[in-house]
């Protein structure tokens, strides 16, 4: 899984490098073609490092880092067990309740925050009605591209996981793949599978059962969620920096609004990481690492030297991220909830899902 994590991080870094190079290419070409343009380029760099810009740099980086720190907030509010406790009846029920809230938060984040913001930009940037309609169709296309990208990534890495431990002689693999229902696994079935697993522990492709269990301990859905969060934090960094470019007051208000929106969202993301196999501290550290996306986004917005330049980037990143969040919520998390057989637990999960959406509605109106 380390190679997979490095590949995901490398992919995102490559996207950022290409985006930065694409923005700097026209400037460098103009600078090499004539002397006056070269002087304008030097003047623009001087403006970038002026005292006003320096204030925007400092405030934007601090604001983006504060937004990233919200990733460790779930440690303060979720006294959640890990390891074997997740496979118990009570632990499974609590995890599914958190996952229900996470689905509501993700759906509310997509349809009440990300897509409306991208829609508002396309409407304001369009010159005519025909152009506005074309940009709105492009917005929907980016949502589909984001969904399919996350589908392709999971298919690629899922095949590699199955090759590492195909399960020949590993009877214990079946119960490891899913969270038990609210009623728990029947004790006799679990005991029987455990005995067969011990008997065949040395027959899993020449390696022990413990090594197979370790290889599949972290699900790819956890890394996909981290990738989506990194891109989401990149857009937050763009918004924070663009606001500080307008004024310090607007920047502080924007930072506070994003923080209020991120807290319930991070709680849901934390539950998804626990479901993927991370322990509490590893999940918090991985959530904190996504703050780098916000810092990169803030630097990108300030180097664009205008809120409009940041807005053009947001116009396609927001719907792309929305597609990724939709994939995580509907494909990776919802199937676990559909396995619930207890009617009372199912009702609780639906109520918590609605609670997550309600929280996002309240934050969207503030």
UniProtKB/Swiss-Prot annotation:
Keywords: Cytoplasmic vesicle, Endoplasmic reticulum, Golgi apparatus, Ion transport, Membrane, Transmembrane, Transmembrane helix, Transport, Zinc, Zinc transport. GO terms for molecular function: zinc ion transmembrane transporter activity. It is found in: Golgi apparatus membrane; Cytoplasmic vesicle membrane; Endoplasmic reticulum membrane. It is a multi-pass membrane protein. It catalyses: Zn(2+)(in) = Zn(2+)(out). Residues 1-5, 79-97, 159-225, 304-313, 365-366 are lumenal. Belongs to the ZIP transporter (TC 2.A.5) family. This is Zinc transporter ZIP13. It comes from Gallus gallus (Chicken).
């Amino acid at each position: 899984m380390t190679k997979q994590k490095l590949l995901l991080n490398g992919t995102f870094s490559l996207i950022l490098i290409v985006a930065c190079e694409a923005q700097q290419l026209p400037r460098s070409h103009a600078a090499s073609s004539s002397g006056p343009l070269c002087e304008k380029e030097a003047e623009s760099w001087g403006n970038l490092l002026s005292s006003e810009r320096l204030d925007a740099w400092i405030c934007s980086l601090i604001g983006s880092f504060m937004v990233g720190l919200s990733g460790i907030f779930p440690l303060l509010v979720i006294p959640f067990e890990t390891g074997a406790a997740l496979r118990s009846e009570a632990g499974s029920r609590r995890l599914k309740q958190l996952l229900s809230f996470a689905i509501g938060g993700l759906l509310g984040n997509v349809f009440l925050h990300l897509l409306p913001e991208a829609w508002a930009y396309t409407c304001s940037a369009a010159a005519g009605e025909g152009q506005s309609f074309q940009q709105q169709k492009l917005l929907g296309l980016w949502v589909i591209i984001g969904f399919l990208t996350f589908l392709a990534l999971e298919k690629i890495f899922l095949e590699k996981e199955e090759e590492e431990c195909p399960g020949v002689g590993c009877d214990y693999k079946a119960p490891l793949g899913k969270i038990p229902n609210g009623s728990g696994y029947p004790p006799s079935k679990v005991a029987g599978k455990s005995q067969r697993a011990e008997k065949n522990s040395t027959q899993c492709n020449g390696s022990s059962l413990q090594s197979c269990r370790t290889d599949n301990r972290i699900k790819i859905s956890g890394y996909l969620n981290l990738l989506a969060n990194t891109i989401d934090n990149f857009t937050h960094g763009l918004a924070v920096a663009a606001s500080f470019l307008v004024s310090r007051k607007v920047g502080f208000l924007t930072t506070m609004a994003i923080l209020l929106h991120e807290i319930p969202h991070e709680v849901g993301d934390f539950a998804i990481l626990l479901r993927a196999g991370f322990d509490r501290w590893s999940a918090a550290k991985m959530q904190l690492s996504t703050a780098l996306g916000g810092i990169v986004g803030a630097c990108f917005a300030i180097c664009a030297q205008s809120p409009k330049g940041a807005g053009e980037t947001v116009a396609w990143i927001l719907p792309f991220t929305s597609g990724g969040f939709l994939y995580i919520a509907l494909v990776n998390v919802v199937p676990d909830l559909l396995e619930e057989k207890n009617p009372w637990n199912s009702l609780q999960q639906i109520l918590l899902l609605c609670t997550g959406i309600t929280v996002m509605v309240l934050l969207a109106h503030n």
